[in-house]
């Protein structure tokens, strides 16, 4: 209004002056003001005096810079009119002058113009600035909006650019007194001039408080003009905090509350919960719980136990908590329904469904509710889980349990299957080895026995059991006690009488090689046991022992031959030699020889007069690979026995004990029996068995055979028959047992074919029990007693056989006392059953040492 009055006063002044001076030239603005960048034009009215205006122009001049923006010319002889100035001349706000000038045309000299002018005030358009969130997901940006209600001028050329500048601070200007320098971050973007637009800006890291100042700058050529500036704007107040939650929910485990902060602000504060209820004026709310949020944390939760049962309204406040007060920045309320249906505790797991291996176990829980008819507990009331017992004693079933869920194979199942397979393999291998040992063929005795050794090199000794090696020579007969040779060149003496059965016919070769267990080792007590005890005593003294145990086996099957130690044979041969003297070398060689306990010297027999006995040739020493205990154990598995298969005799000795005197047997009724004049079964020397054996003392009896005798290397040719021996000593006397033993020295030197090492077959063995030996030749001896074996054992003393042709023992030639017969009775000695026809039958078999 004041401006209008001023303009009006100026116009009146001009009119008065013109009137006084006689001139009426002036400029009149159509609008006193204008808006820059707007699309409206500026009009100017002009009036001339006397109606004559020639060469008149109107200039638009910017007052601040005194720069003429444009010039407009009036028509000739036009005294009045209106001029329009376009909007694009007014780009900036400020003061503008319209000046009218005139030039004289009737004079050659220019007439100084009388200027007339008008003043125009131009202002900036009004822009509105707004801030908004970019989106709920994009939390690090915000938008700045720039709007104006003024229509903008359509500039024909390049439009002027707008520079939008945003300044971030962490405090207000009035709060900066006494503090450190405030944080100030600037960001700007250049945009085109528009009536309205949104410009996006990124949020710098300011902190829990942020203030924004927005400045709009017009970019002109060479200079910047600030259109507007607003701020600082508190973003927390502008946007505010928001608590994101459901309007109503059923609390099962807890209530989760999320804080949505304003743009470019980090959350830091406290969330409090309280129950919405009517309160008296001035009554404070009772907060149930408070959860603090660290810098940058936006989410927290409250347990359902804070809320009451049923449906209630609870409010959550977010603010800054101090020691004195709590300033809430945001409040949000919601309805919370807490159900009384809830699950109880899980019951213990049930037992595994399988006793071993993989199984399933189960546990249950109960829904605690006020209405059992409609339980509303969410979730499962029972659950199952697999269970596995690794210490399963039985094998796992081939098909898995139907209750077992499908699962990958575990490492413990692989270990279990591997262990079971290994156990099965061991069991099958054990059974096969046992059957092979029981039914297979036993290994042959091929290694010759060493001299002066109780066990062959291939023999195995089980504990302290006596090793007795079998010989595989056909069974033959003994020679008479007085007719047998005392020794042969290189043959050691055998201190124990034994008999051999007649060889089996050729058709029995296969049956005899099928069974090795039937041809087992047996021992003839008691004299033989005494000699073994003597030999054992020597071994104990050599080893420094005072007590040991030997195991002897007795079986009802016929006795078999075994290897005879060369030392024992040499001892018997030395006893039969005249004078009984021996050289130091012979004494050293026969250090462990077993001598006869009957110290009677045998009759001297000439070497040239004595015919060879049927057993008067050497046999190769053999060593067995099967111990006596193993052989008899196999026989005891095949045939039943009234007693145990093992009989144990314990011999305790001491070096200080005195040897008891030998008991002599009465052999008054013994009569010498002739021997066949020739040996029908002469054998060749066994070079492998006799090689390496030192010459024995029996070599001195046959000096003419020294070159051909089987010494260390043995002999390869057969023995020639020797003439029948004649007595060279005193008149014939009744030979005792020692004579008989000396006479059977050469019986152990006969080699056997390998067939008999495996023993006769069961069929052949049964035949040998009934017919132990074939009948003797016509010039031989006839059977003394026709009694059966059982009756013979009951009535007669079972002593050594009188003749190899006799099938059963005949002791009529022995005059033994009743006590001696009881002592020497083998079934009574072993405690066997006399009624058993197969128990401890002493048939025409071989005797063993």
Swiss-Prot record:
Signal peptide positions on this chain: 1-24
Region (Disordered): 472-516, 595-799, 828-849
GO annotation, cellular component aspect: cell periphery; endosome; endosome membrane; focal adhesion
Keywords: Cell junction, Disulfide bond, Endosome, Glycoprotein, Membrane, Phosphoprotein, Signal, Transmembrane, Transmembrane helix
Disulfide bond annotation, renumbered to this chain: 352-387, 356-392, 367-377
GO MF term (any one): extracellular matrix binding
Stretches of the chain found on the membrane's Cytoplasmic side: 435-849
Pfam families registered for this protein in UniProt: THSD1_D2, THSD1_D3, THSD1_N, TSP_1
Sequence positions bearing Phosphoserine: 463
The TSP type-1 domain, residue ranges: 340-393
Skewed-composition ranges (Pro residues): 720-732
Location of this chain's protein in the cell: Endosome membrane; Cell junction, Focal adhesion
Transmembrane segments: 414-434
Protein's recorded name: Thrombospondin type-1 domain-containing protein 1
């Amino acid at each position: 209004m004041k401006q209008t009055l001023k303009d009006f006063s100026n116009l009146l002044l001009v009119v008065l002056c013109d009137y006084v001076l006689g001139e009426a030239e002036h400029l009149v603005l159509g609008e006193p003001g204008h808006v820059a960048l707007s699309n409206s034009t500026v009009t100017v009215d002009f009036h001339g005096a006397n109606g004559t205006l020639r060469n008149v122009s109107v200039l638009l001049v910017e007052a601040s810079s005194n720069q003429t923006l444009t010039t407009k010319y009036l028509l000739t002889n036009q005294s009045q009119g209106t001029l329009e100035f376009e909007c694009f001349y007014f780009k900036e706000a400020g003061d503008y002058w319209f000046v009218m000038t005139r030039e004289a045309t009737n004079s050659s000299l220019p007439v100084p113009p009388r200027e007339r002018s008008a003043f125009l005030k131009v202002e900036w358009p009004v822009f509105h600035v707004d801030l908004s969130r970019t989106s709920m997901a994009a939390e690090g940006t915000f938008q700045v909006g720039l709007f104006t209600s003024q229509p903008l001028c359509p500039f024909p050329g390049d439009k002027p650019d707008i520079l939008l500048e945003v300044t971030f601070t962490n405090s207000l200007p009035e709060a900066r007194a006494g503090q450190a320098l405030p944080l100030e971050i600037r960001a700007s973007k250049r945009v085109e001039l528009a009536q309205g637009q949104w410009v996006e800006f990124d949020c710098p890291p300011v902190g829990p408080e942020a203030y924004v100042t927005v400045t709009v700058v017009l970019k002109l050529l060479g200079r910047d003009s600030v259109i507007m500036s607003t701020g600082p704007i508190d973003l927390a107040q502008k946007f505010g905090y928001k608590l994101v939650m459901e309007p109503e929910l059923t609390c099962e485990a807890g209530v989760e509350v999320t804080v949505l902060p304003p743009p470019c602000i980090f959350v830091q504060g406290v969330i409090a919960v309280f129950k919405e209820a009517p309160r008296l004026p001035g009554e404070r709310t009772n907060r149930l719980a408070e959860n603090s949020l660290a810098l940058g944390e936006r989410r927290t939760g409250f347990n359902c136990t804070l809320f009451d049962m049923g449906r209630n309204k609870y409010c959550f406040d977010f603010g800054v908590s101090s020691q004195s007060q709590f300033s809430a920045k945001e409040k949000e309320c919601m309805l919370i329904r807490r159900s009384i249906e809830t699950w109880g505790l899980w019951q213990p797991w049930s037992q595994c469904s399988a006793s071993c291996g993989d199984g399933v176990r189960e546990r249950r829980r109960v829904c605690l509710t006020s209405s059992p008819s409609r339980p509303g507990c969410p979730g499962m009331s029972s659950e199952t889980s697999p269970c596995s017992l690794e210490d399963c004693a039985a094998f796992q079933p081939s098909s898995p349990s139907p209750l077992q869920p499908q699962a990958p194979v575990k490492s413990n199942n692989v270990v279990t299957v591997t262990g079971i397979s290994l156990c099965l393999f061991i069991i099958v291998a054990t059974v096969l080895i046992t059957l092979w040992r029981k039914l297979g063929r036993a290994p042959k005795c091929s290694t010759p026995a060493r001299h002066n050794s109780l066990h062959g090199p291939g023999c195995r000794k089980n504990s302290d059991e006596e090793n007795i090696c079998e010989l595989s020579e056909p069974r033959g007969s003994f020679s008479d006690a007085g007719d047998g040779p005392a020794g042969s060149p290189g043959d050691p003496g055998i201190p124990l009488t034994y008999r051999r059965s007649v060889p089996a016919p050729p058709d029995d070769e296969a049956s005899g090689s099928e069974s090795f267990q039937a041809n087992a080792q047996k021992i003839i007590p008691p004299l033989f046991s005494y000699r073994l005890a003597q030999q054992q005593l020597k071994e104990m003294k050599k080893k420094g022992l005072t007590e040991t145990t030997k195991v002897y086996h007795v079986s009802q099957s016929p006795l078999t031959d075994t290897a005879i130690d060369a030392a024992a044979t040499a001892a018997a041969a030395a006893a039969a030699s005249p004078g009984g003297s021996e050289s130091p070398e012979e004494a050293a060689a026969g250090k462990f020889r077993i001598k006869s306990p009957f110290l009677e010297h045998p009759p001297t027999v000439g070497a040239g007069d004595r015919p060879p006995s049927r057993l008067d040739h050497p046999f190769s020493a053999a060593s067995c690979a099967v111990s006596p205990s193993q052989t008899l154990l196999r026989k005891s598995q095949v045939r039943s026995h009234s007693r145990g298969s093992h009989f144990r005799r314990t011999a305790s000795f001491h070096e200080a004990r005195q040897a008891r005197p030998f008991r002599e047997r009465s052999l008054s009724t013994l009569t010498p029996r002739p021997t066949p004049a020739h040996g029908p079964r002469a054998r060749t020397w066994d070079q492998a068995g006799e090689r390496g054996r030192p010459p024995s003392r029996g070599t001195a009896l046959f000096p003419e055979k020294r070159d051909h005798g089987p010494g260390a290397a043995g002999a390869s040719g057969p023995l020639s028959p020797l003439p029948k021996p004649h007595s060279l000593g005193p008149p014939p006397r009744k030979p005792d047992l020692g004579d008989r033993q000396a006479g059977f020295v050469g019986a152990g030197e006969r080699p056997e074919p390998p067939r008999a090492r495996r023993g006769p077959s069961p069929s052949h063995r049964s035949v040998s029990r009934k017919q132990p030996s074939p009948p003797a030749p016509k010039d031989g001896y006839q059977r003394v007693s026709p009694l059966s074996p059982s009756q013979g054992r009951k009535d007669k003393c079972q002593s050594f056989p009188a003749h190899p042709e006799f099938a059963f023992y005949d002791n009529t030639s022995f005059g033994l006392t009743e006590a001696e017969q009881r002592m020497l009775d083998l079934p009574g000695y072993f405690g066997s059953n006399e009624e058993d026809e197969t128990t401890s039958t002493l048939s025409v078999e071989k005797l063993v040492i």
